[in-house]
Amino acid sequence: MMIGKYYRNREERCISGGTGCGVVYLSGCDMHCAYCLVYEISQKGAGTPATPRQLADLLLSLQERGVSHISLANVEPSAGEVVEAITIARERGLALPLLNNFNGYAPAALTRRLLPYFQGYVMDFKYADAALGERLSAAPAYPARAVENLALLSSHYGPNRYAENGLLQSGVLLRHLILPGAWQNTEEALRLLAKHNPCGYPLSLLPDFVPEGNTAAVLSPPYTVPAGRLRQLQALAAELGISLL
């Protein structure tokens, strides 16, 4: 297992509060997004070797820094070691909610295995267009897998539960990166979510495209969705009954 980087960050308010969210990126990924924001970590394996006990130490140190939640990204390639680390950390006093920052693409059996160790998921819902998923992420089965995984999360967590201060106690947040020029993918992703989100999990629409991967293969240089287009997509989400963060 390799730890790519870790830090305190401002995420969605319900997982950051006033103290921030602890974010840990593990190295490796089961997708190959050409535009990945952490391309060196996810695709090239950059990072520092770590044992489960060392990852447990890191989780406890983030708790000591006062974060409200801890989000672990790229869990699936190191699933066994992550489970061991979480078990050690819980035995040593880790009390914070743990979130799996999840790309949505893992096989269902692996998702089932990991669910009991996390209080929630922050799940990407990247593609409704399977061909686009294949071209940009080498993930042609993405829409079907994402829908299957969302069903598993919905069954396991049920509707989101929040503390009195508005912080997420258990449940799921969804994210969708709006890819430049691929507006139809976003529109269809919203329609697909509307059909397969029985618990009404809220969605963050992400308008800032900042590729750091194989720039020859991505859709565009760094780009922010025009305000008018973003309003159209937000209006479609509202029309479909999707709650936006």
Predicted regions and their residues:
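Conserved Radical SAM active-site core
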Residues: 2-116
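Hydrophobic faces of well-ordered beta-strands that scaffold small-molecule active sites
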Residues: 22, 70, 98-100, 121-123, ...
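Conserved non-cysteine loop/helix-boundary elements of the Radical SAM core domain that shape
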Residues: 41-54, 74-81, 132-156, 182-185, ...
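Active-site beta-loop-alpha junctions enriched in small/polar residues
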Residues: 75-77, 103-105, 126, 177-179, ...
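Alpha-helix-loop-beta-strand connector modules within alpha/beta enzyme cores
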Residues: 85-95, 148-153, 230-233
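Short amphipathic alpha-helices and their capping/turn segments at secondary-structure boundaries
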Residues: 106-117, 190-200
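Non-cysteine beta-strand/loop elements that form the S-adenosyl-L-methionine
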Residues: 115-130, 202-209
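Auxiliary Fe-S-binding modules of radical SAM enzymes
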Residues: 158-245
